[in-house]
Amino acid sequence: SFTHSGNRLFFADYQANGYRIASLPADSLLAEKTDFDRPVSMPFVETLAGQEKFNLDSARLEPVDFQPKRYRKGVHTFKIHSWAPFYYDVAEAMNTSASDLSTIVKPGATIMSQNTLNTAIMQAGWYYDKGYHHGKLSFTYQGWFPVVNIAADYGDKAFDMAWAQNDKGQQVTRGYYTGRTYLEAEARIYLPFNLTRNHRIRGIQPAVSYYFTNNRYQEYGSREFHAFQYVLPEILFYNYRRKAQRDILPRNGYQLRLQYLTTPFNKENYGALYAGRLTTYWPGILRNHGLMLRFGYQYQELDGKALYLPKHLLEKPRGYNFQYQTHRQWAFKADYALPIFSPDFSIGSLIYIRRMRANLFYDLSRNQARSKGAWTTQSSFGTDLIFDWNVLRMSYPITTGVRLIQPIDYGKFQVEALFSISF
């Protein structure tokens, strides 16, 4: 392509070491007629051809009789393509690449299946966590509209939460583990309306999820036990600039998610939960740097309700693991991502290291446990040191790294491992 002034032409020049960017002054270009009956002289190509003993033009090709067969979707739903000697949640790993990373690798094993049409994706795995064995199965089918996703996790011990009277005559909840094996299941359907155009990735995605666990909670009035379950309708709007190959975050754009959580089978104990989350992307100080600012607010109805929901829609500040009781909560997160080094280094066919990068972050959360109650603060800061690489010449990029976290209000310095993968 020519420069804006039109006085120089840029083009890709292929050499022995690969492609390189080259340019020529526009006034040096030759305007000559070409005779297509005469082959164009290319010294580099002729040198390579002289080293080869096989000439495709003189090869004798035998005809192949192909017999077409009908492709039956049901028979070809599952096609195992890879496995791992550890466990990780593929869906979680894929969803963290654009906004955050998480510590999701556990001891165990994983197998993954994806059919030829890329409409049926399955993951089955076993993992060991906190002294218990777990079995995990997830399946996504994208051949319909809407997309359907189901997942189940079986392991650990289930518990019951019951009402009891304390020494002061007050009604309080007391939990105890049971002999039941813990079961957690979720079904989700969503409509991926893709409005992408040119360099803007845009879309609207309404969704509804149903969540079930066999942990049981006793209702305050009727004293009946019910398994904890909820319904979560939500809608996602997104519009951001397509990333260049070296970009870590989009240069500009936003994602807006609105959510409403309700427990239709246990309304005596729990009120509805509303949440809104806004993610914005901004250019950094230097090229390929990126700034991500995230804002969130959630509100839980407590009037006439006996318990707080054991579920939050806003993410906790990094470095805090305690689930706070909340009536109202707002959150702010800032991430600044920057590349450190792009070595393009490989060790034979074992590994290929594409890039080393860093992410500086600050998290702040303000929480009010009850109406007219005091507000509490949880905040932290830290950095991520991350490697983007490929292993054994697999086409799936892998992201690994380490996270250093320093809670500000209380808590100790922490170190976490990071993992993510893209398919």
What are these regions (language model features)?
Residues P25-F145, N149, G221, H226-R251:
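Outer-membrane beta-barrel initiation region
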Residues A109-S113, L137-G143, A152, A185-F193, ...:
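Residues on the lipid-exposed face of transmembrane beta-strands in outer-membrane beta-barrel proteins
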